[in-house]
Amino acid sequence: VGRVHYDLSTDFFEAMLDPNMQYSCALFAEGDDLGSAQLRKLDWICERVRLRPSLRLLDIGCGWGGLARYAARHYGCQVVGITISREQFRYAQRWCRGSDVEIQLRDYREVTGRFDRVVSVGMVEHVGYKNYRTYMRTAARSLAEDGLFLCQGICGNFSRVHTDPWIERYIFPNSMLPSLARLTRAAEGVFIVEDVKNIGPNYDPTLLAWEKNFRSAWPRFADRYGERFRRMWRFYLLSCAGAFRARSLNVFSIVFSKEGSAIGSSVRDERQAVPSSRTAVLESIGNCAPCELHR
């Protein structure tokens, strides 16, 4: 999948995505454009794992480095990001230069070192059901005893061992959408679930914004990719938007702590407090009405 999908030209993704190169579900409030909604998502993720200066953060599946760069610059963290895409690796290395970020080209199972926080956004869809347990154990091995792990990704409503054949063939080879049940089962005896949020309704407007950007930018890429690719890519974006609107797909954001860790009790307590001015963004989440954005 790294070669087939994520190694498409970086300028193509730059044209479709927001300035922070976020290729995952945004978090919309009324009046947000794509860029604002993706910034809201970045802050929300950083606050969910209680980032603060000097913490070491591992970003599993860091993409083009947007979250890693944001966490280092706005939360003062030391970040290691990993990706299996050579295009993403080269781009992220350049883009994160000057920030306290190290980008590595490696499989998540090869990660070394210990981190105060681990995040994995939009990557678990590429793990596969046979490897969910390994994925959880790898995150646990990489996490400090009092750390937090955030796993966020697209989930189906049923536990399956296959994926949509069209998506498998043309868009994401070897991909598989987990269910929430599968992920939490894989974490049994490894992690404690501290919090779960479903932000899936926000993916419909995210995908529609990408499709709009894609259509606007298409004249620049028509000669390079051709009409067949244009039809395929629009079908991918719009069919996925329809699946989220129909609630066939969801996006679960799960915060885990290690079994026996004392940090879990304070996670729930601190949800009632505002530890920094940046968490003001969270107050608006309760007022979000993502489904109304379709009207």
Predicted region positions:
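Substrate-binding/catalytic lobe of Class I Rossmann-like enzymes that use SAM or dcSAM, i.e.
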Residues: I154-G264, R271-Q272
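A short acidic, Gly/Pro-enriched loop at the edge of an enzyme's catalytic core
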Residues: R109-V118
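Conserved beta-strand signature within the Rossmann-like core of class I S-adenosyl-L-methionine
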Residues: D146-G153
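Conserved SAM-binding loop of SAM-dependent methyltransferases across substrates and taxa
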Residues: W64-Y75
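A short glycine-rich, Lys/Arg-flanked "PGG" loop and its adjoining helix->strand segment in the class I
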Residues: R133-E145
